[in-house]
């Protein structure tokens, strides 16, 4: 039986596409992780709506450990995920430049 690799879910930020995380995805895979690059419509749906889509994606992943690496608004999507769907597999969450205290862009969008 082959040991399953830990999974890192990459969640991009506002105004960009999942391809923006491609170099990180390649580096993580070369480092032995399995990756899932979650691309979502950051301008037309709320972080909560995108978190629901992320949860649906996670339900189809066969992996024992899930880590999250999120940039900017992607970190808010992950926060909504854990708030709305608290039962998650073990793993770590890393957010980069996430406006946890709010931002001007968030105020004018919603």
Regions found by a protein language model. Name each.
Residues 8-19, 23, 27-110:
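Serine-dependent carboxylesterase/thioesterase catalytic core
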């Amino acid at each position: 039986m082959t040991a399953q690799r830990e999974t890192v879910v990459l969640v991009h930020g506002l105004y960009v596409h999942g391809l923006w995380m491609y170099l990180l995805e390649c580096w993580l895979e070369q480092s032995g992780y399995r990756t899932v690059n979650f691309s979502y419509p950051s301008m037309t749906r709320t972080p909560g709506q995108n978190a629901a889509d992320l949860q649906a994606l996670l339900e189809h992943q066969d992996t024992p450990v899930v880590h999250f690496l999120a940039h900017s608004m992607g970190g808010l999507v992950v926060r909504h995920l854990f708030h709305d769907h608290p039962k998650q597999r073990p793993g770590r969450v890393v957010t980069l430049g996430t406006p946890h205290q709010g931002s001007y862009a968030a105020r004018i969008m919603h």
